[in-house]
Amino acid sequence: MALILFFERGIWPLVPESAVVSSLFSVTIKSEVNDLELISAEESLVAVSFKPGFIIKETPSVKVQQPSLGVLSKACSQLEEYFRGKRKHFSIPLRTNLSIFHASVLDEVLKIPYGEVISYQDLAILIGNPGAARAVGSALGKNPIPIFIPCHRVIGSDGRLTGFVGGLDWKRYLINLESN
C-alpha cells in the first residue's frame, strides 16, 4: 500500500508502492512566515509542508510517529541556519518518487546558486526541452521537498514571482532572504 501526499494541487505517491516503509517521522518547526512540517522515511527527508498536519495520510501499513534523532534533527538544524543566513547549501539525504521529467527538472533546480533566480523558460532550456516552460512550472508545483530543492529560485520570464507550493509570500520571503 502506498503512502499518499495530499497537496492543494493534487495528490501523488510519497514513496513507491514497492518500497518498504513502516514508519514516517514528522516534526513541525516555527519560522518567520509560518510553521513548516518536515517528514522523513528511514534516513531521508521525503517532504516539506507549508501546512502542518495536511501533507500525509496514514495507511494500515504506515504510521506517522514523532521524530527520531537523525535526518529530521539535522534537517531542522540546517533549516534554522538557512533562515539565519548562515547556510547556503543543504546536506540532507532526499528521497522522491517522481517521473523522469520531474526528476530532471528538480535535479537542475538543485544547481541554481543560492541568491540567484532563473526563469521557467531558462530552466526548460537547461533540461534540453525549450518548449516545456509550462511543464517545468507544473513539475515545480509538485516538488515534495521545497526549500531543500529550491524551486523558489524559478521566476517568470518577465521577472515576476509566479506560483509556489508555499504561496507567493513564502517565495518572496525566501528570495529576499537569499538576496541579502
Give the predicted meaning of each segment.
Residues 2-131, 177-180:
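Basic nucleic-acid-binding alpha-helical/helix-turn surface characteristic of O6-alkylguanine DNA
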Residues 134-143:
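Regulatory, non-catalytic segments
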Residues 147-154:
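Short Lys/Arg-enriched helix C-cap and helix-to-coil transition segments
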Residues 157-180:
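…primarily DNA-binding HTH/wHTH and HhH modules…
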